[in-house]
């Protein structure tokens, strides 16, 4: 009986470890994707603002 209780405890700990590791990896991937999307949005806004200003400065307007 002690052996099956020990096996059950080990299985639960193993499952919790796997679930925690997977959740942590998913959260890291989501955070990285959010950071990439934010960087793309910033560069898009920056270039969208600067390119017309630079071209009008070059053209002398």
Swiss-Prot record:
Where does the protein end up?
Secreted
Where is this chain primarily localised?
Answer: secreted
Which residues does this entry mark as bearing Glutamine amide?
59
What are the GO cellular component annotations?
Answer: extracellular region
Residue ranges the record assigns to the propeptide: 24-41
Q: Keywords on this record? A: Amidation, Cytolysis, Hemolysis, Secreted, Signal
Signal peptide (residue range):
1-23
On whether Signal is a keyword of this UniProt record, the answer is: yes
Any keyword Coiled coil? no
Which InterPro entries does the protein's record reference?
Pilosulin
* Post-translational modification remark: Truncated sequences of this peptide have also been found in the venom. It is possible they have been cleaved in the venom.
Q: Which GO BP terms apply? A: killing of cells of another organism
Tissue expression pattern: Expressed by the venom gland.
Judging by the UniProt lineage, the source's domain of life is Eukaryota
- Purpose of the protein: Acidic peptide with potent hemolytic activities (94.8% at 50 uM). It also shows low antimicrobial activities against E.coli (MIC=50uM), as well as histamine-releasing activity (28.3% at 10 uM). Does not have activity against S.aureus, and S.cerevisiae.
- Family affiliation: Belongs to the formicidae venom precursor-01 superfamily.
Entry protein name = U-poneritoxin(01)-Om5a
Instruction: Name the source organism.
Output: Odontomachus monticola
